[in-house]
């Protein structure tokens, strides 16, 4: 591990109520790309291998702990019962935590989800030889942000937007809030803020900058790799904007790595994607969780894939939903198919339109063309399932299994009442209700006999 990161402690400020979100849950639990805003930050800082990660929260602590995944790292949760500013939030941790004077304290914000690990490493590595380092950014529209004030090129203070003079508001270098401070100096400077509050009776963390400057410290600063990394979320419009930025960035990476997207503005990745070569993804496709796609796969418009493995040369026609499933090579799915609940589709299979497959193994070279439901089933090779076939797997108390062995033909509009076994080579006639096991190569049919009803002619005039 790099020496610069060995003494690293992280504080993530997440106590804001998100009033402008008009919500009943903590702002940092609202989702960006399918996971909580705060989770984006945590997932990145875990790569820094800090000694401790402290999350300062304001309310709904139980809900936060439930929704946030620690990925095996022990997160420390600190309550800021009264939201009295960013300085007050950091005080809740730094005055209670025991550590070495030389510890580096990285301060982040739970509502700034797109900051990159490369930018954080850049900030940490540049901190060597300084007591305090800031992440600043130069942006075209700095309204709402605190301005960086420099004297002779050196940072001397930060002025909040509402306190800035007209001349200061022309400054385009802004404070992102992200900083690294040595523990001794952070504690020392925060002590000086104990009795210093703004007009809203809040303690601003940014006030330590002027204290540091006046005591002879040089305030180090670096810029993010990309400006959008420092954008925060205070309302749902800003959340939507960052969602769009995030999705376009993901799409660019995929395009540059050989994936063809029909329209990168209409692609949605809400998890992770591992992919092979020569993949085509049409518009309005949503990928969730862990998605693994092999070579030469084609995915039609409007499909939703969640926690799936798709092997080589699979074609998925439009508006198919595939969740928690594995598709073997050379299969053709959809349109409007629904495959889910640990189903496994073997090689060279056809699953047609309006077919639902749940918790089922569907064997090699088998076909189910349309309008069928196959649940809790084990289906062999070379099986043909006719239109309208359903497995009746639930008896009111438990799910029961249907087993269809190799080379079976099931006629259209058949009902298979589980538990039932249809042995190899059997033929089930159209419209049959199967209530008991069928022997090998048997041909069975059970349907109401067709008959005519004679109508008397009406001779009345």
Swiss-Prot record:
Residue ranges of the region described as Pyrophosphorylase: 1-236
UniProt xrefs under CDD domains: GT2_GlmU_N_bac, LbH_GlmU_C
Domain of life where this protein originates: Bacteria
Reaction equation(s) it catalyzes: alpha-D-glucosamine 1-phosphate + acetyl-CoA = N-acetyl-alpha-D-glucosamine 1-phosphate + CoA + H(+); N-acetyl-alpha-D-glucosamine 1-phosphate + UTP + H(+) = UDP-N-acetyl-alpha-D-glucosamine + diphosphate
UniProt entry tagged with the keyword Nucleotidyltransferase: yes
One GO process term, biological-process aspect: lipid A biosynthetic process
One Pfam family hit: NTP_transf_3
Chain residues that bind Mg(2+): 111, 234
First and last residue of the signal peptide: none
UniProt-annotated stretches for the region Linker: 237-257
GO MF term set: glucosamine-1-phosphate N-acetyltransferase activity; magnesium ion binding; UDP-N-acetylglucosamine diphosphorylase activity
Pathway: Nucleotide-sugar biosynthesis; UDP-N-acetyl-alpha-D-glucosamine biosynthesis; N-acetyl-alpha-D-glucosamine 1-phosphate from alpha-D-glucosamine 6-phosphate (route II): step 2/2; Nucleotide-sugar biosynthesis; UDP-N-acetyl-alpha-D-glucosamine biosynthesis; UDP-N-acetyl-alpha-D-glucosamine from N-acetyl-alpha-D-glucosamine 1-phosphate: step 1/1; Bacterial outer membrane biogenesis; LPS lipid A biosynthesis
Presence of keyword Cell wall biogenesis/degradation: yes
Binding site for UDP-N-acetyl-alpha-D-glucosamine: 27, 80, 85-86, 109-111, 146, 160, 175, 234, 358, 373, 384
Region (N-acetyltransferase): 258-461
Cofactor(s) required for function per UniProt: Mg(2+)
Entries under PANTHER family matching the protein: BIFUNCTIONAL PROTEIN GLMU, NUCLEOTIDYL TRANSFERASE
Function according to Swiss-Prot or TrEMBL: Catalyzes the last two sequential reactions in the de novo biosynthetic pathway for UDP-N-acetylglucosamine (UDP-GlcNAc). The C-terminal domain catalyzes the transfer of acetyl group from acetyl coenzyme A to glucosamine-1-phosphate (GlcN-1-P) to produce N-acetylglucosamine-1-phosphate (GlcNAc-1-P), which is converted into UDP-GlcNAc by the transfer of uridine 5-monophosphate (from uridine 5-triphosphate), a reaction catalyzed by the N-terminal domain.
Quaternary assembly: Homotrimer.
HAMAP family for the chain: GlmU
Official protein name in the record: Bifunctional protein GlmU
Lineage: Bacteria, Pseudomonadati, Pseudomonadota, Gammaproteobacteria, Enterobacterales
């Amino acid at each position: 591990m790099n020496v610069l990161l060995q003494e690293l402690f992280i504080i993530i400020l997440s106590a804001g109520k998100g009033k402008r979100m008009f919500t009943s849950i903590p702002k940092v639990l609202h989702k960006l790309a399918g996971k909580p805003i705060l989770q984006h930050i945590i997932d990145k800082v875990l790569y820094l291998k800090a000694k401790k990660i402290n999350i300062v929260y304001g309310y709904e602590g139980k809900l936060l702990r439930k929704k946030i995944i620690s990925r095996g790292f022990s997160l420390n949760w600190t309550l800021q019962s009264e939201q009295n500013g960013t300085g007050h939030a950091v005080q809740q941790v730094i005055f209670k935590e025991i550590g070495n004077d030389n510890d580096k304290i990285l301060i982040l914000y739970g509502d700034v989800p797109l900051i990159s690990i490369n930018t954080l490493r850049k900030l940490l590595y540049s901190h060597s030889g300084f007591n305090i380092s800031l992440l600043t950014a130069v942006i075209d529209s700095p309204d709402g942000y605190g301005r960086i004030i420099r004297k002779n090129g050196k940072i001397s203070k930060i002025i909040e937007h509402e306190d800035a003079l007209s001349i200061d508001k022309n400054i385009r270098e802004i404070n992102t809030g992200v900083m690294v401070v040595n523990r001794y100096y952070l504690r020392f400077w925060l002590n000086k803020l104990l009795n210093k509050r703004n007009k809203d009776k809040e303690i601003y963390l940014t006030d330590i900058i002027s204290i540091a400057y006046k005591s002879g410290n040089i305030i180090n600063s670096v810029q993010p790799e990309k400006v959008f990394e420092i954008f925060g979320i205070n309302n749902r419009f800003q959340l939507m904007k960052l969602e769009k930025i995030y999705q376009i960035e993901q799409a660019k990476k995929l395009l540059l790595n050989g994936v063809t997207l029909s329209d990168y503005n209409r692609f949605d990745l809400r998890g992770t994607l591992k992919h092979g070569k020569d993949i085509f993804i049409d518009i309005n496709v949503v990928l969730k969780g862990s998605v693994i796609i092999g070579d030469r796969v084609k995915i039609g418009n409007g499909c939703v894939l969640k926690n799936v493995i798709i092997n080589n040369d699979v074609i998925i026609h439009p508006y198919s939903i595939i969740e928690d499933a594995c598709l073997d090579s050379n299969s053709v799915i959809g349109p409007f198919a629904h495959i889910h609940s640990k189903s496994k589709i073997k090689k060279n299979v056809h699953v047609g339109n309006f077919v639902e497959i749940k918790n089922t193994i569907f064997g090699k070279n088998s076909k189910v063309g349309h309008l069928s439901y196959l649940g809790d089933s084990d289906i062999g090779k070379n099986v043909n399932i006719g239109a309208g076939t359903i497995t009746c797997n639930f008896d009111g108390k438990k799910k029961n299994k249907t087993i269809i062995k190799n080379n079976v033909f099931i006629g259209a509009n058949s009902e298979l009442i589980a538990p039932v076994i249809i042995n190899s080579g059997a033929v089930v006639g159209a419209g049959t209700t199967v209530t008991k096991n069928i022997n090998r190569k048997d041909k069975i049919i059970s349907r109401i006999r067709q008959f005519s009803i004679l109508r008397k002619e009406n001779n009345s005039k």
